[in-house]
């Protein structure tokens, strides 16, 4: 709405929501019949963020059911039904364990930490990131490759707990009820079965350091992070109720699994073993704790991760769905970028299938899809801002193959029908 000032010949505009004038705010956005100021926009965004944070529908006791957690995971992650089921049950039980602990019952419910094993690009990290969006307990992600044992250059394992504290705004009580996801856990495996003069500061030493915080201990965490020193004050965090989820690609584990049970023999009478033609994800389904020990994880560490969830290789159909269906699907993202240039981006179905096959050939899974699309669309995104009258860009299979350029459809104002040209 607008109001005319006493001495001003100009109209003063007011926010339709809070009533502030255009002079009291930084920005006033006009609609057909209403105005909204930047402060009200920020307030609306805060409300939306709060609602999305608690978007899980909860049952009467305040604990989201596994199916409700699974439903939210389905919005962002395609396939991987078994891993979703394992995570949904684990998070549901985590909520129940926290509720149970407050009632001081006689039976103590122990936590079941989880190990996610799957090929590169199968969705391990995305599952964890999606959980972070929807949980109302503190959640943090850590990278195992940055960790070293105490006394060496690198991050202490206590830094993981510090990140959880930061995620809970330094509320120790909330942090003690949180969930931690440690990515690239396979990178801290022992480098060799044989003892060495050189100390393995980022392998077995880190596993030993992680044992206590995963099992449950009172960790002393420097409030500002970094290394500890005697004059520093520490925050005491009990990790007993913190749920740990570890994930890794475990490259080479499939060979260990395939060899197990085959038996070995030598000489002229030895039987010839047929090669294992199964895909990596299929082989991972047969994983046993002993395979992880051979890979380089120490027995105590494997014992603290009793739940093993494996992820499968993504086939062409799954990769095509990943390109199109999730809320943050890559095709939707690029279409939105082109919309900002007032251009419609269209992918033919055969083109998406070819993109999926290229990702499979590269053995990069879903992670390789963005790289392929960037290569395909690079020249178009470079040229498009300088072109006039382009209404639509069509990507066909020959474009993905690099045999031709995308089809540009121009809107010709002087003719009834648009003219199509290849650019």
Curated annotation (Swiss-Prot):
Lineage, uppermost ranks: Bacteria, Pseudomonadati, Pseudomonadota, Alphaproteobacteria, Hyphomicrobiales
A Pfam family the protein falls into: ClpB_D2-small
HAMAP family named in the record: ClpX (MF_00175)
Gene3D superfamilies associated with the record: 1.10.8.60, ClpX chaperone, C4-type zinc finger domain, P-loop containing nucleotide triphosphate hydrolases
Any one GO biological process: proteolysis involved in protein catabolic process
Subunit and partners: Component of the ClpX-ClpP complex. Forms a hexameric ring that, in the presence of ATP, binds to fourteen ClpP subunits assembled into a disk-like structure with a central cavity, resembling the structure of eukaryotic proteasomes.
Cellular component per GO, a single term: HslUV protease complex
Residues covered by the ClpX-type ZB domain: 3-56
Alphabetical UniProt keywords: ATP-binding, Chaperone, Metal-binding, Nucleotide-binding, Zinc
The protein's name: ATP-dependent Clp protease ATP-binding subunit ClpX
Annotated binding of ATP, by residue: 119-126
Record's function text: ATP-dependent specificity component of the Clp protease. It directs the protease to specific substrates. Can perform chaperone functions in the absence of ClpP.
Family stated for the protein in its record: Belongs to the ClpX chaperone family.
An example Gene Ontology molecular-function term: ATP hydrolysis activity
Binding site for Zn(2+): 15, 18, 37, 40
